[in-house]
Structures are given as structure tokens and as C-alpha cells.
Amino acid sequence: MKFSTALLCLLLTAASFSTFVLAQPDSVSIPITCCFSMVKRKIPMQKLESYMRITNSQCPQEAVIFKTKASREICADPKQKWVQDYMNHLDQKSQAQKP
């Protein structure tokens, strides 16, 4: 009887602690997109639709993810001149489309 009472107390304590941990906002797992390899060659500009910068501290390196019109995502090095030029072009294109 003493053993089952002790076990019940232990389980209740563990359950209350796990509820506390799950209620913490930092314990929520948010999916993170990271790039582990970069494209080596230029992508044809006419195939691109948009881009997204990846600067998350949990990723091994900074990157730019270009999204193509075919919905593919391609990682590129933001330090490369052509990548910067493409980002500027896409920014100007999106500004021109806004009324």
C-alpha cells in the first residue's frame, strides 16, 4: 500500500512538472528552414518569383532562398554579387506591382 501511494505521488509530481514545461513559450518547437548547400551557378532570373533571407542563429550559415515560378526553393549565398543583384531586382519588381 505504501509503495502504490508513493508511486502515485511520484506520477502526479511528474505530470504536473511536464504540464509546466509544455506551458512555457520557449518549449514550443517552431520549424526552422536552413540551407546546408548553396547553388553553384546563376539561376535564370526569369524563373524566379520571390526570395527569403535566412538569418536564424540555429542555422549553420546565412542564406537566401529563391522561390521559382515552379515552386522550387533554391539556396544561394547572399555574399555573391549575382544573388544581391537578383534580390534587388525582385524587390523593385514587387514595389512596382504595389498600387
Curated annotation (Swiss-Prot):
Cysteines paired by S-S bonds: C34-C59, C35-C75
SMART domains for this protein: SCY (SM00199)
MF GO annotations: CCR chemokine receptor binding; chemokine activity; heparin binding; phospholipase activator activity; protein kinase activity
Keywords, alphabetical: Chemotaxis, Cytokine, Disulfide bond, Heparin-binding, Inflammatory response, Pyrrolidone carboxylic acid, Secreted, Signal
Stored InterPro entries: Chemokine_b/g/d, Chemokine_CC_CS, Chemokine_IL8-like_dom, Interleukin_8-like_sf
Keyword NADP attributed: no
Residues spanning the signal sequence: 1-23
GO CC terms of this entry: extracellular space
Pyrrolidone carboxylic acid: modified positions: Q24
Subcellular location: Secreted
Pfam families xrefs: IL8
GO biological process, one term: exocytosis
Origin: domain of life: Eukaryota
Task performed by this protein: Chemotactic factor that attracts monocytes. This protein can bind heparin.
Assembly mode: Monomer or homodimer; in equilibrium.
Protein family according to the UniProt entry: Belongs to the intercrine beta (chemokine CC) family.
Protein's name according to its UniProt entry: C-C motif chemokine 8
Gene name tied to this protein: CCL8
